[in-house]
Amino acid sequence: MTISYDEEFSSLMLRWRGSIWKAVLKDLIGFYIAYYIVLAFQWYLLDEKGKEYFTGWIMWCEIGAQYIPLSFLLGFFVSLIVARWWEQFNCISWPDKMMIMVSACLPGNENMVVRQTIARWSSLQAAIAWSGVSVKTLKRFPTERHMVASKLMTEEEYDLYMNTDAPHGKWFIPILWIVNLIKKQKQKGIIDSIQMDMLLKQVYSYRDGFAMLFVYDWIKIPLVYTQVVAIATYGYFFICLIGRQPKLDQRSMEKEITILFPIFTTFQMLFYLGWLKVGQYLMNPFGEDDDDFELNYVLDRNTAIAHMMASELSDQLPSIGAPMVPAVPHTRASFKIQDVIPKSHLAGFKLSEAEMKLIKPEDLEEHERLMEETKVTNRQRLGTLVRALEKKSRTNATINEDDEE
């Protein structure tokens, strides 16, 4: 079940379900047990020479642990898993748009049975398809007889479904029943070609979500990458069993502070193992972990919504004519926290009166004349400046010749 939370930060850290504490507790306890076994071996069973030799192993493991690119591996792995997790959620099919189109194209009490049948088959489609990817839905509908008992499938539909030979799966059969029912309404003249096309587009869109979930269930994250990340993480902390031990030889105890509890290693385990557990839990979001998707709830919700749209909401229309007010009132609570009205970054930009004056054709001619006069004046000034520079250059050259003589 997806865990919701909106408490303050201090209360959030004390949550258990779906928390980091629950995710890493067993691994943390196992690490502490192994850590203190190694510490007891070093403390009680090694003499001074053995402790000096063991200190060399500690230093060697400390250096070796730095060569494992754990942050890079976990960062890329979890980013891939989270993106895939959200994409799978977006593949969950919702019948709302399809049932809205069904209600629009098949109105009236005379089409009530057709609308309700399409609604029921949409829920049957979800129950069959999700039973193939979700453990929770499979436990709810372990066999097709359970769908008959749940009134999602009739005995006739059960016989048709079971007698269909489909070696590559038959989860799509209810969708075909919906398509055939729409075709029948077209043949009867109840809907036209345009309405049929709009209905079929919604049915195809509804079907695509189930197909993509089967694709995600089929194509997993490559096993070799999952193994690399798991081996790197657990291998890192296996090295830390020795590399983070206190140095108990006489020389080291005189120079360094000896701390018997692995404080910083504990923080690393919370971060790195918590990171790894996120990827492991989200890799299959249709299992039974705390943060897995509740497809049983989605099925209940979709069934109720589809039934409402097919029956009591299909032709419901309140009376019209009530005037619309230009402003929606606030409560005292919402009035205190009104949002700042967004403004364009050019809202305060203003031009002067001269800049806002419109340019007329005669103004353009006058402007071009003035520009031409300005160019002529500039050329004259430039020519005068060049001649002055040449004259000064000749004068300087003459002075230099006189000095040489």
UniProtKB/Swiss-Prot annotation:
Q: How does the record say this protein sits in the membrane?
A: Multi-pass membrane protein
Which keywords label this protein?
Answer: Membrane, Transmembrane, Transmembrane helix
Listed transmembrane segments? 28-48, 63-83, 223-243, 256-276
Q: Where in the cell is it found?
A: Membrane
Q: Name one GO molecular function term.
A: chloride channel activity
* Gene Ontology CC terms: membrane
As for family, the record states:
Belongs to the anion channel-forming bestrophin (TC 1.A.46) family. Calcium-sensitive chloride channel subfamily.
- The protein here is known as Bestrophin homolog 14
**Gene name?**
best-14
